[in-house]
Design a protein with these regions (language model features):
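Central cavity-lining transmembrane alpha-helices of secondary-active solute carriers
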Residues: 47-65, 264-276
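Helix-loop-helix hairpin linking two adjacent transmembrane segments in secondary transporters
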Residues: 134, 139-196
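Intracellular juxtamembrane helix-capping segments at the cytosolic ends
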Residues: 119-133, 325-340
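C-terminal ends and interior cores of transmembrane alpha-helices
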Residues: 81-99, 296-308
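C-terminal transmembrane helical hairpin of 12-TM major facilitator-type secondary transporters
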Residues: 284-331
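Cytoplasmic helix-loop-helix junction between adjacent transmembrane helices
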Residues: 103, 109-145
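Extracytoplasmic gate region of multi-pass secondary transporters
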Residues: 27-29, 216-264, 271
Length: 353
């Protein structure tokens, strides 16, 4: 009982860290504000999200190797510090002499945000395996639910800061960075002072090529492809769902903005899926649950292809949102459990996908 209670207490700073992982989604939340403040074109504003996620390709596998050298907890701490620094820097853009220098400060900030998030996503999942001895997929899914909370509130805070008349130290929408900086500090201190029993590091740490060779394992390769499909569905649904609704339900004169609620509907069911999935997977066999959510996504694709009524398209969005919310955690957990001696490297490969 004491070990169970200790594990639950240890998970608290880890879940706060999952919340900081959601900071990366503030890029989309503030891109419109930045476009207005800096007079950016659409293509320039859309470059910021690409800048953030570019670093996943570069840092994911090296982070897996770094964990073998310094340990998982230290690697996660480094990622939180980088992320916290990233959200701290924009608070000082008013001290920069020109708009151009302010913009470069944001470029550096978002680059650090991407680097920190790549390191964090790669290292925090193996860290959880040292705390939770059972129900790994369920715990990782709950962590994704906590992350989704940060993703959900980021645009709300930015919008409030941009429109409120309350005194915000002149920060306007940048108040989001201040609040997230404070949470980042809490995450850093809480994890730093939490004792986590680490597994011994791999004395023969894998190199980059050795990590890529792991794709020779059928399970690892299929998991890698599964993660890529998960990301593709996630990004694709966000981008295309409003356009599909406009095409099928729109009337002459309607604009895309009328159907942007499709993205919110998707995220609502994705968040619901993370929360309920973390509970269901403690009761139901993971393979059975995985089969159910795959069927849900299959039905969703049918709805997107053939649906013409509003309820059919809404159902398709809800099904893919709920189903896709649990794919990442299930696939990643099964991949890491299949190679218990190479969890760090497996995590790096999966995040690179």
């Amino acid at each position: 009982m004491n070990n169970s209670n200790n594990s639950k207490l240890t998970l608290i700073p880890v879940m706060i860290t999952f919340f900081t992982m959601g900071f990366v989604d503030l890029v989309g939340a503030v891109s419109n504000n930045m476009q207005e403040d800096f007079g950016l074109s659409d293509s320039a504003a859309n470059f910021f999200p690409s800048l953030v996620f570019f670093w996943f390709l570069i840092f994911s596998v090296p982070t897996g190797m770094l964990m073998n050298k310094i340990g998982r907890k230290k690697t996660v701490l480094i990622s939180i510090i980088i992320t916290t620094l990233a959200v701290f820097m924009p608070l000082f853009d008013s001290f920069m002499p020109t708009k151009e220098s302010q913009l470069w400060l944001m470029y550096v900030s978002f680059s650090l945000l991407g680097i920190g998030n790549a390191v964090m996503q790669t290292s925090i999942n193996p860290l959880v395996t040292m705390i939770v001895k059972g129900h790994l997929a369920s715990t990782l899914t709950f962590g994704q639910f906590v992350k989704a909370i940060a993703s959900f509130i980021a645009p709300l805070i930015a919008a409030w800061g941009a429109t409120t008349t309350a005194p915000l130290l002149g920060l306007s929408w940048r108040i989001l960075f201040l609040l997230f900086f404070l949470v980042g500090m809490i995450a850093t201190l809480s994890l730093a002072f939490t004792h986590i029993e680490e597994e011994p590091g791999d004395e023969k740490a894998s190199g980059f090529v050795d990590c890529l060779k792991m794709l020779g394992s059928p399970l690892i390769l299929l998991s890698f492809i599964g993660i890529m499909c998960h990301v593709g569905i996630d990004v694709g649904t966000n981008a295309v769902a409003p356009k599909i609704l406009l095409e099928r339900l729109g009337e002459p004169g309607d604009s895309l903005s009328k159907f942007e609620y499709a993205t919110s509907l998707y995220f609502a069911f994705r968040t619901l899926g993370c929360f309920t999935g973390s509970i269901i997977m403690r009761k139901l066999n993971i393979r059975t649950f995985f089969a159910i959510i795959v069927v849900m996504m299959g039905l969703s694709m049918i709805g997107f292809v053939f649906g013409t009524e509003q309820w059919e398209l809404w159902a398709a969005i809800a099904l893919v949102g709920y189903g896709n919310s649990n794919v990442f955690s299930i696939v990643l957990s099964q991949a890491m459990l299949s190679e218990p001696e190479k969890k760090n490297e497996v995590s790096g490969l999966m995040i690179m996908g």
